[in-house]
Amino acid sequence: MKNLYRFCQRAAISLSVVLAAVIPSLASADYRWNFPTPVTPIARDTLEIHNHFMIVITVLFVTVFGIMIFSMIKHRKSVGHQPARFTGPTGTVQWLWALVPFAILLFIDYVLMGIPAYHAVIDMEDTRTKADMVLKVTGMQWKWQYEYPDSGIKYLSTMSTPRDQIANKEAKGEHYLLEVDNEVVLPVGKKVRVLLTSTDVIHTWWVPQFGVKRDAIPGFLRETWVKIEQPGIYRGQCAELCGKDHGFMPVVVRAVPETEYLAWVDEKKTKLAAAAAGSDKTWSKDELMASGKDVYEKQCAVCHQPEGQGMAPAFPALAGSKIVTGPLLSAEGKLLKDSHLDRVLNGKEGTAMQAFKDTLSDAEIAAVITFERNSFGNKKGDLIQPAQVKSLR
């Protein structure tokens, strides 16, 4: 009895020391005890199953450990009990003690837990039944591309948190690392079939309040679905380690009523049409430089760095680069292989340099090429017009 008392005393002291160290840090942290508020059927089912499992596990834990602790105290050697020699079930009671727990575990695993989990998984994978629209999500280092095939809308979404906040040069905002320049807009109450793929490495599209976390894998088209039940803005991020700026790939979804969604579609189409029309316009140097700076900061600075110094050997410097300041066209006016413009349009095989011809408009490519050739100490002085890019695609 004295040994048991000493053990309990030491355990209590150890637990007190651990709690004294941990509780202050928990008090200062934004700590969540449960899942975020679900806003889709998948998230709600997941939460309900989680709570159901926790109840079953808690009952099992209390029952099993209660019996164990009672047996250890009740049948201890100090009160005269002798150890039994157990060679296997021999009597009816011993057979019951062996078979009843086995039957209980089967019931718990296959009925209490298995049936609800089975139906939830089947529902999660039913992406096509009664789907109202399709959203295609393409992951790339380190941004997302969203496409609405039914509406002819396609655009990039990149993190908009200022780099000065990341470098601790200014105070961090409310949605630090969870804000983007172009959010996803979806209608409330509509089942959206989500198709996912990637252009480079594996990414994971994850929005906690949707209960959705699905890998985007190069060469594969994977599926999931969401049906948002409440208007609002929902934030997530890439949940798969995908390289240098993995932590800078947020996902922001704005759920709106259907009428507001249709108005957004019309507005987005108008903006995209205006951007396409920019290919036939002659841009001034100031216009190209201003637009190019914006494109560079969103699409290029993450690898080539804000001042064009790069991060060798993976991300070459643009400042003083012979490729950036070299010729773009041959004497016949054709695009030179491996030139600055060719690399931006078609990428560089075997490197992290991806092709931008399918993600940036003619005007954006012309602007960023002009900006890079006339910044970071590069003084090429020439201008690239969107019409030139259009003709060389």
List PLM regions with ranges.
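Non-transmembrane, membrane-proximal soluble domains of secreted or membrane proteins
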Residues: 29-52, 72-294
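The canonical Cys-X-X-Cys-His
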Residues: 194, 238-239, 292-306, 344, ...
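Extracytoplasmic/periplasmic beta-strand context in beta-sandwich domains
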Residues: 203, 249-252, 316, 351, ...
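Sequence/structural segment immediately N-terminal to covalent heme-attachment motifs in c-type
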Residues: 285-311, 319-346
